UniProtKB/Swiss-Prot annotation:
Top-rank lineage group of the source organism: Eukaryota
Cellular compartments annotated: Membrane
InterPro entries: AAA+_ATPase (IPR003593), ABC2_TM (IPR013525), ABC_transporter-like_ATP-bd (IPR003439), ABC_transporter-like_CS (IPR017871), ABCG_transporters (IPR050352), P-loop_NTPase (IPR027417)
BP GO annotations: pollen wall assembly; response to nematode
One Gene Ontology term, aspect cellular component: membrane
The ABC transmembrane type-2 domain, residue ranges: 434-644
Protein name: ABC transporter G family member 1
Length: 740
């Protein structure tokens, strides 16, 4: 797909756009956007007033927040490598060396990390790969399971609860996980629908998105699709800013970012950090990991923490770096990038015999000296119009001043002399039906712009139906016709499930988007499951009708219109249960390749135990449970009953009894003589027109006697709901997005 806005590649134009708004806070930017729109369309209601934001001469006086963390320690168990010697228990116990190497080892990823930062600041965590940067960000963002992380994380001196943190914070992952066929504006609008409350009118949500687009400096790319390998879209720097915009749409108090400048050139990286600086100035605490900032990026940072193999080797402002390393004995040259010099020195020390132990100890002494000399006192909120507020009251006051649009509802209390607020913190910004509606709309919009995906599915169903129709063309009611009908039904019903395997990559492609959005309560997991089912169902109806119309009359199936209706219903139920089963597996398997392997294997077992290859009465007792778990069994038995339920219809008459046997090759005269001999032996008159096998007899021969066709239909549908419920629990248990 051609790029919609050709000017998006002009980074200098974007940089000028950013420079033009310079250090405007979000509140100022909203006001500017409102004024422009008011002049253009005569709107008399400023955006900042519409969002209930209180400004004084364009500047929002934010409520102060201080985030502190003390003695954060995180250890993980490292399993020993598989060794041939470890496979023998006797040798492992006899050889102390082998026994020692076989025991799991503990690796320390964070070792007593402490620090603090406040609103209006950007704190950057630096270090080489494996130093613990991302681990520290995860620890502060509550992405490490309780019990695994030691230490405390506090906001304004109060321990942060998990539910509260989800509401007031946002986390931007290192990878840009976006829907490729949505435009930038649509992507941010859907984020606004999720994170902003229903009480905010849609018109004001749109203005919020437009203001954010201007703040991010991506106005020229607003109508451009995100793009992927097959569709040209926005640039890497723009994708990164869109990813940030998704998570700051509700103006969070805490913003965590994992290497937001990774993979970007110096200009794009500077523009991204420039955006983060304005976010911080709007009253947020911004904490990010960064690999190697340029000189310009360093000028935007307020606090630095250097890590080396889980230890703090420096904590302080960028301005204090030269003095720190001078006192350590390694002065930074004048024209040298401070952070590059520090990182290079740390790498050299890590490769030396003593490691960074000396630098770690020096940092501890240096921090103590600064505290004793009172040069760096602990951060405390400055004087503000909100003294002595609890954390919830401070958050409520911050909401009333314009922060955290979806974070809660501040409720004023008090009389003439008091102006305190309390906070009602909702777990989610919107009710479930709004979430389902928004999720469904987004999924359908993304799918509608990729019609080739549905086209491939319906083409495969129609082609398969056409092949079956030509192979099993107009089957008669002879014994051969009965046998061919059984083969057609077995293959047709299994085809429904194999076709559903195409749905496997859908959730696997969306998995990390889902994990990012649900990690901070953008929507409920149950809403996603219901939306997923709602969006997929219409396509299943089209597939069912297409297959039924292609095969029903061509094969010569019986039952008339009522038989056709049931045939369509059981095919639809098969598609439903098959897609639900594949959807459940997509929540379990880690990759598409493994998923396809498992789906093909399990569906083969379902077909084996369906009753076509081996009668139910012949299945061993230790495998009979698989017969009842087979998804192919119930649709197969249902279509058999739909075809052979007429007890008056005959399928074997007179000499046809010899068909499908060696005697079937005899001349008709010989068959009649044999039939007469059999009649005399049995004492029953059997003529050439005597009906010997009806549809009911065929059902009994196939062992289809336990359930009616409607019961089989209901069980097939129930299997679909069962696997959707299992899918929900896999999301609930498997998408905690936390380290163990």
């Amino acid at each position: 797909m051609a790029r919609i806005v050709a000017a998006n590649d002009d980074d200098s134009m974007e940089l000028n756009t950013i420079s033009s708004i310079h250090d405007s806070t979000l509140g100022q930017l909203l006001k500017n956007v409102s004024d422009v729109r008011k002049m253009a369309i005569g709107d008399e209601t400023p955006v900042h007033e519409s969002l209930n934001q209180d400004y004084n001469d364009g500047y929002m006086r934010t409520v102060p927040f201080v985030l502190s963390f003390d003695n954060l320690t995180y250890n993980v168990s490292v399993r020993p490598k598989l060794d041939f010697r470890n496979l023998f228990p006797r040798r492992r116990t006899e050889d102390p060396e082998i026994a020692q190497t076989a025991r799991p080892k503990t690796k320390t990823l964070l070792n007593n990390i402490s620090g603090e930062t406040r609103d209006g600041e950007i704190m950057a965590v630096l270090g080489a790969s494996g130093s613990g940067k991302s681990t520290l960000i995860d620890a502060l963002a509550n992405r490490i399971a309780k019990g695994s992380l030691k230490g405390t994380v506090k906001l304004n001196g109060e321990t942060l609860q998990s539910r509260m943190l989800k509401v007031i914070s946002a986390y931007v992952m290192q990878d840009d996980l976006l829907f490729p066929m949505l435009t930038v504006e649509e992507t941010l609008m859907f984020a606004a629908e999720f994170r902003l409350p229903r009480s905010l009118p849609k018109s004001k949500k749109k203005l919020r998105v437009q203001a954010l687009i201007d703040q991010l400096g991506i106005r020229n790319a607003a109508k451009t699709i995100i793009g992927d390998e097959g569709h040209r879209g926005i640039s890497g720097g723009e994708r990164r800013r869109v990813s940030i915009g998704i998570d700051i749409i509700h103006d969070p108090i805490l913003l965590f970012l994992d290497e937001p400048t990774s993979g970007l050139d110096s200009t794009s990286a500077f523009m991204v950090v420039k955006v983060l600086k304005r976010i911080a100035q709007s009253g947020s605490i911004v904490i990010m990991s960064i690999h190697q900032p340029s000189h310009r990026v360093l000028g935007l940072l307020d606090r630095l923490i250097f890590l080396s193999r889980g230890h703090t080797v420096y904590s302080g402002s960028p301005a204090s770096l030269p003095r720190f390393f001078t006192e350590f004995g390694s002065p930074i040259p004048e024209n040298e990038n401070r952070t590059e010099f520090a990182l290079d020195l740390i790498r050299e020390l890590e490769g030396s015999a003593g490691g960074t132990r000396g630098l770690i100890e020096f940092n501890k002494k240096w921090q103590e000296m600064k505290k004793q000399s009172n040069r760096q006192p602990p951060l405390t909120p400055p004087s503000s119009p909100y003294p002595n507020l609890t954390l919830k009251e401070a958050i409520a006051a911050s909401i009333s001043r314009g922060k955290l649009v979806s974070g809660g509802e501040s409720v004023a209390h008090g009389g003439a002399t008091t102006n305190t607020t309390t906070l009602a913190v909702p777990a989610f910004a919107n009710p479930m039906w709004i979430e389902i509606k928004t999720l469904s709309k987004r999924s359908m919009l993304n799918s509608r712009r990729q019609p080739e995906l549905f086209g491939i599915r319906i083409a495969s169903v129609v082609i398969t139906g056409f092949i079956l129709a030509t192979v099993f063309w107009r089957l008669d009611n002879s014994p051969k016709g009965v046998q061919e009908r059984l083969g057609f039904f077995a293959f047709a019903m299994s085809t429904m499930f194999y076709t559903c395997a195409d749905a496997l990559p859908v959730f696997l492609q969306e998995r990390y988007i889902f994990m990012r959005e649900t990690a901070y309560n953008a929507y409920r997991r149950s809403s996603y499951v219901l939306s997923h089912a709602i969006v997929s169902f219409p396509s299943l109806i089209f597939l069912s009708v297409a297959f039924a119309a292609t095969t029903y009359w061509a094969v010569g199936l019986d039952g008339g219109l009522t038989g056709l209706l049931f045939y369509c219903l059981i095919i639809l139920a098969s598609f439903w249960s098959g897609s639900s089963f594949v959807t459940f597996l997509s929540g379990v398997v880690p990759s598409v390749m493994l998923g396809y392997t498992i789906v093909v294997a399990i569906l083969a077992y379902f077909l084996l135990f369906s009753g076509f290859f081996i009668n139910r009465n012949r299945i061993p007792d230790y495998w009979i449970w698989f017969h009842y778990m087979s998804l192919v069994k119930y649709p197969y038995e249902a279509v058999l009953q739909n075809e052979f339920s007429d007890a008056t219809k005959c399928f074997v008459r007179g000499v046809q009894i010899f068909d499908n046997t060696p005697l079937g090759e005899l001349p008709e005269v010989m068959k009649l003589k044999l039939l007469g001999t059999v009649s005399k032996s049995l004492g029953v008159t059997i003529s050439s027109t005597t009906c010997l096998t009806t549809g009911s007899d065929i059902l009994r021969q196939q062992g289809v006697v336990q359930l009616s066709k409607w019961n089989c239909l209901f069980i097939t549908v129930a299997f679909g709901f069962f696997f959707r419920i299992l899918f929900y629990f896999t999301l609930l248990l498997g998408s905690k997005n936390k380290r163990r």
